[in-house]
Amino acid sequence: MNIIEGDFQNPGSARFAIVAARFNDFVVGHLVEGAADALRRHGVPDDHIDLIRVPGSFELPLAVQQTAEAGRYSAVIALGAVIRGGTPHFEYVASECTKGVAATMMDTGLPIAFGVLTVDTIEQAIERSGTKAGNKGAEAALSALEMVSLMKKLAE
């Protein structure tokens, strides 16, 4: 049996777009830092990383779609933080963001890493942006690197 999987090697000419929400930036800023740092540590030069900011997580799917369709990137990394409040708003934003980003990945065939936190509390968001539970932005960047590598291998 042949096993084909991606790796985290420097993808050479690969370009990455980080599309990040400004809302909850006290969390998302750390996700962005984690993602950029992970890419750099794996050999991606700064001039191959673009940061695109949107108002909030609800706007991520459209920006991710436009970025993916532009044809300039090997992968897109979507970052945001949706924190549950006392209204159903959380469910709507989290659900539509997730569905929109997933639909874009399937429609374009471009790897899109989902690093949008959907949490119950501010504490959970902070934990997942670089403290107790690691940095989910860095994890999303590693997922993007691995998927770029895998897509290249599958095309050979």
UniProtKB/Swiss-Prot annotation:
Coiled coil, from the record: none
Similarity comment: family membership: Belongs to the DMRL synthase family.
Functional note: Catalyzes the formation of 6,7-dimethyl-8-ribityllumazine by condensation of 5-amino-6-(D-ribitylamino)uracil with 3,4-dihydroxy-2-butanone 4-phosphate. This is the penultimate step in the biosynthesis of riboflavin.
Top-level taxon: Bacteria
Binding site for (2S)-2-hydroxy-3-oxobutyl phosphate: G86, T87, R128
GO molecular function: 6,7-dimethyl-8-ribityllumazine synthase activity
Key words of the record: Riboflavin biosynthesis, Transferase
Protein name in UniProt: 6,7-dimethyl-8-ribityllumazine synthase
Catalytic reaction equation(s): (2S)-2-hydroxy-3-oxobutyl phosphate + 5-amino-6-(D-ribitylamino)uracil = 6,7-dimethyl-8-(1-D-ribityl)lumazine + phosphate + 2 H2O + H(+)
HAMAP family documented for this protein: Lumazine_synth (MF_00178)
Catalytic activity, EC: 2.5.1.78
InterPro entries linked to this entry: LS, LS/RS, LS/RS_sf
Location of the active site: H89 (proton donor)
Subunit structure: Forms an icosahedral capsid composed of 60 subunits, arranged as a dodecamer of pentamers.
Cellular compartments per GO CC: cytosol; riboflavin synthase complex
Transferase keyword on record: yes
Residues involved in 5-amino-6-(D-ribitylamino)uracil binding: F23, S57, F58, E59, A81, V82, I83, F114
Gene Ontology process terms (BP): riboflavin biosynthetic process
Pathway as given in its UniProt record: Cofactor biosynthesis; riboflavin biosynthesis; riboflavin from 2-hydroxy-3-oxobutyl phosphate and 5-amino-6-(D-ribitylamino)uracil: step 1/2
